[in-house]
Amino acid sequence: MRSEGDTWDITTSVGSTALFVATARALEAQKPDPLAVDPYAEIFCRAVGGTAADVLDGKDPDHQLKTTDFGENFVNFQGARTRYFDNYFARTADAGVRQVVVLAAGLDSRAYRLDWPAATTIFELDQPQVLDFKREVLARAGAQPRAERREIAIDLREDWPQALRDSGFDPAKPSAWIAEGLLIYLPASAQEQLFTGIDGLAGHGSHVAVEDGAPMKPEDFETAVAEERAATAQGDQRVFFQLVYNEQCAPATEWFGNRGWTAVGTPLADYLREVGRPVPGPETEAGPMIARNTLVSAVRA
């Protein structure tokens, strides 16, 4: 379970979920018709080694990401999510935004793989050990960012708005924000603080994109946590429900809409259909998760 002030690297606690998601992106890139191609996802997996690399080589057929009930649907989910936010950044760049803020950047490689206009600055915020891992791995691979990239090593439960300003962020200029795969790891109070921080720093013409998820029924969540703990006691290394908070301060469309933003939410299931990927049914392991997920983008006039 989580604790106040807990920290992590890329192979422990919340950090390990970034590696799991990167593995899914790498598997998506292996498809003949990928929704998105992140060449650095595989580099991260091979830097860690073990099952993260084995599954890419077909050496771990029992890996969770290879199951039909969960894995195939989760890989589709990550491919679709990546495309959605990639397209979001293309739109914000076309709109003239030159400040980008990646909250809980994890193994996000958009600074390296997307085409950014000249004079774009990308601020990446995350735990120090996570940023260190990404920088070192990409440096060994000879990768160079395609925009000015500034790391801000900070926990989002701390005063990250001040740290962002100290790193050269200008609230008077338009900015584009992303909170991808983040909110579930924050209690409702911290989500509220995060949204408030964005709202306080985003000037006119700014954009924000959020992956939003409705909470599970409390009894279902408690059952999932109990089952996962029992599996952990039997040696299962997979942990998810013990890392998340089954809370929501408010739907992102509602929160930002009530503060003068024009917000549009796209249910993940609808977006999967739009990009030609199947939507898993409620009887599958991945189905309920996908049904609760909404991709949100908002703009401040």
UniProtKB/Swiss-Prot annotation:
Binding site for S-adenosyl-L-methionine: 126, 155-156
Keywords associated with the record: Methyltransferase, S-adenosyl-L-methionine, Transferase
SUPFAM superfamilies per the UniProt record, alphabetical: S-adenosyl-L-methionine-dependent methyltransferases
Pfam families on file: LCM
Molecular function in Gene Ontology: methyltransferase activity
Gene Ontology terms: biological process: methylation
E.C. no: 2.1.1.-
Function comment: Exhibits S-adenosyl-L-methionine-dependent methyltransferase activity.
Family: Belongs to the UPF0677 family.
Family matches, as NCBIfam families: mthyl_TIGR00027
UniProt cross-references to PANTHER family, sorted A to Z: S-ADENOSYL-L-METHIONINE-DEPENDENT METHYLTRANSFERASE YKTD-RELATED, S-ADENOSYL-L-METHIONINE-DEPENDENT METHYLTRANSFERASES SUPERFAMILY PROTEIN
Protein's UniProt name: Putative S-adenosyl-L-methionine-dependent methyltransferase MAP_3777
Organism name: Mycolicibacterium paratuberculosis (strain ATCC BAA-968 / K-10)
